[in-house]
Amino acid sequence: MNQKVKSIFVVLLSLAIVSCEVERGGVDNPVTQGERPYVIASQGTFSNTTTNALLTASTLDSGVVGMDQGLVNDGASYWVFWGDKYLYGLTYNQGNAGTTRSYVMNEDYTLSARSAEYAVRRFTTVGTYNKYIMTTSTGDGPQEYADENGFLPKSILVSLLDVEAETYTTNNTLEEHYLAENFLGNGEFVTLAGIEQVGSKIYSAAVPMGLSQYGVKAEGGKWVREGYADLIKRESGGSGSGAYKEGELQWTQYPDECWVAIFEDESLSTKRLIRTDKISYAAGRNKSQYYQMIWRTESGDVYVFSPSYAKTMADERQRTTLPAGVVRINSGSEEFDPRYYVNIEAMADGRSFLRTWYVGGSKFLMLMYDSVLEPAKTMTATELAIFDAEAATLTPVTGLPAKSSISGFGSTPYAEGGKVYIPVTLTDNYPAIYIIDAESAVATKGLTIQATQISGVGRLEPINS
């Protein structure tokens, strides 16, 4: 699959840093003039100093590349390849804005930073739509909408980066359609997970988050389900993405359903909601990030995955009974296909998955948990599998290093020509790009990077080519 201009490659810096320091080596894989080179986002810790560098290579199939000739940068939380034209480094800071800038490939195959920098506000999901890189999160709405108790409603916060014009805009939350409260008609507020362009529209999973302080009090408390009032927090507590306030009902009361919002455009002003009770909500979770689980394929069909993350909830009432699975919205339709459902857990010894990525044809790469999802359990995910949506098969990937040696994967693979290229960071050696044959699910070792971490890979064309 060669990703087009509107496609997205997103790379989250979630990999563990290799515990031992390594020495930097030289480049033996120089860029060949006339080729469209690969770009690799790397990080190295040498002599107690951490350096981030964007590297180039003429192939990912073999060789060794060092950090010496890379473009040093400040690093990023997400590296977004906007097709093969621009590379954006988005920085996420918990609760705050982070600095974002973009890069291009010059005619001489060197990389350079573009002039504009942006302070992008916090986000929990990211995607592309038309000319934009688009991020969203859910946060406090405007003071003008405060209730009689002074509680603020939750609103959807949208940021739009116009990649050609190098401009950055945010939404006006005074516009009522951005309210996240009672989004699904059950009183709960939502956050969006995934931004997938389907034709001229945006498909996104609407993930119910429970009742905010505002939602608990709304309409005399009508949205608190019978028998659930004891779930309302009596004091503030928690930390990070698990923080809560006194008077809110944290996490959804409706874990056994999945909603998809279909928006007309980036304004989110007009939407259609569709629901299925075959799967739980469609989002992978890691701290405050909501991983995309909704993907359009080359055929136009849209597949919606649920890892059933709600199985980890402490209270049984908020714990889903549905296994991790996948449903489909057929090309040209805006309804779930009632005939299509695949139980992923049944094919994976009861295990679920943390991430999914579309890699071409009817194939998806899945990052599988090592054990079943349970409450209060520390989960690791060091196995990969190929899911064929048309054949409804799940094939474990072979040929990877031993699980005990893997400390993480690059957050988004690069796919072309039936092959999937994914960075693998190791505890006992340099990280490397592994090449997975999407048909056979066999992985082979490719390019080695003399660094401590690879956070992503993609391709860029020279700007005037």
Regions found by a protein language model. Give the residues of each.
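Beta-propeller blade signature
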Residues: 54-58, 100-104, 151-167, 217-269, ...
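Repeated scaffold domains used in trafficking and secretory/extracellular systems
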Residues: 72-84, 116-131, 180-195, 281-294, ...
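Beta-propeller domains
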Residues: 253-336, 350-351
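Beta-propeller fold detector
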Residues: 62-75, 109-120, 165-185, 270-280, ...
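C-terminal motif of bacterial Sec signal peptides marking the signal peptidase cleavage site
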Residues: 15-19
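Intrinsically disordered, low-complexity segments enriched in Gly and acidic/Ser/Thr residues
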Residues: 337-430
